[in-house]
Amino acid sequence: TMSKMIDWSDRSTCVLFGDGAGAAVVSAEETGVLELVQKSNGAGKGVLSCKARETRNLLNHESETKEYLYMEGQPVFKFAVKTVPKCVEEVLKKAEVKKEEIRYYILHQANSRIIQSVAKRLKEPEEKFPMNLSLYGNTSAASIPILLDEMNRNGMLNRGDKLVLSGFGAGLTWGAVLLEW
């Protein structure tokens, strides 16, 4: 969970994250994953990563090393708003699917401004970009499965809907998948 990796003394980062878990059950069907794009660039490893820090246990005075999430917010924001739309466009182009065919874009719930910026860059209405960030914060890799489950339970997804799921994370890594529900 994210709370175990958060540096609670870093006020610019700790307030953004929440704990959550997500999973998906997949099976062989006629529909499903239509296309996938997955990329990484290690040159950005320093702006979003885990860093080790030695701490001292106050009870027994022994030192221990603990890894904490480290994030430089501005570079991550700029990376996401530039890279996610390109990745979405690439997955659609590879699949020969038009934006008008997409019911929803389900993005990693990192930051509402990132999601709004991606919608604007793709020239798509924000209604096609559901968000639950205000409920849970950034739950890291769990954010897309949690949102997908909520949408399914709320009757927002119908058989045959085309969805684009897209996320980014440490390293820096990013990707998108086009699927038919």
Region locations from a protein language model:
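Acidic, glycine-rich active-site loops and adjacent beta-strand->loop/helix elements
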Residues: T1-K4, E29, K39-N41, L135-G137, ...
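Acidic-glycine-rich active-site phosphate/pyrophosphate-binding loop
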Residues: T1-M2, T55-E62, I114-E126
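Short secondary-structure boundary micro-motifs
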Residues: D7-S9, A80, E90, K120, ...
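Condensing-enzyme catalytic core mediating Claisen C-C bond formation in acyl metabolism
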Residues: W8-K78, K82, K86, F168, ...
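Claisen-condensing/thiolase-fold acyl-transfer catalytic domains that form or cleave C-C bonds
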Residues: P85, R103-W181
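Stable alpha-helical structural segments in soluble proteins, enriched in small hydrophobic residues
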Residues: C87-A95, L147
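Short, surface-exposed connector motifs at secondary-structure boundaries
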Residues: E96-E101
